[in-house]
A protein has these predicted regions:
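Sec-dependent bacterial lipoprotein signal peptides
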Residues: 1-18
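Long, charged/polar, soluble alpha-helical segments
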Residues: 16-102
């Protein structure tokens, strides 16, 4: 009977270990799109601070994603998206103030 209890507890522990967060595909895609949009308006030139913040958060998020650390990756993908959107908006505003056509 003890071996039966040991098998059941082993099975339960392995099932608990299988519980995980699904890959954050939406957050990944939104961050990637925001990075590309910021790059398209030359945010690296016109909003370098926010661009660097976005790029660094995105780089770290992809590393965590590849390591299947999805909960941490979600936070960084969201941080990257927000920073990239701010960089894009700042770059657009600066370029418009300078009279550039976008």
């Amino acid at each position: 009977m003890k071996w039966c209890a040991a098998i059941i507890s082993t099975i339960l522990l392995s099932l608990v270990g299988c519980a995980h967060v699904a890959p954050p595909l939406i957050e990944y895609t939104l961050a990637d799109t925001a990075i590309k949009a910021a790059k398209a308006v030359q945010a690296v030139r016109y909003a370098p601070g926010k661009w660097h913040e976005a790029e660094e958060a995105y780089r770290q998020a992809r590393i965590l994603y590849n390591e299947r650390e999805y909960e941490q990756a979600i936070d960084l993908f969201n941080k990257a998206r927000i920073a990239a959107e701010k960089a894009e908006n700042s770059a657009r505003l600066t370029r418009m103030r300078n009279g550039e056509v976008l």
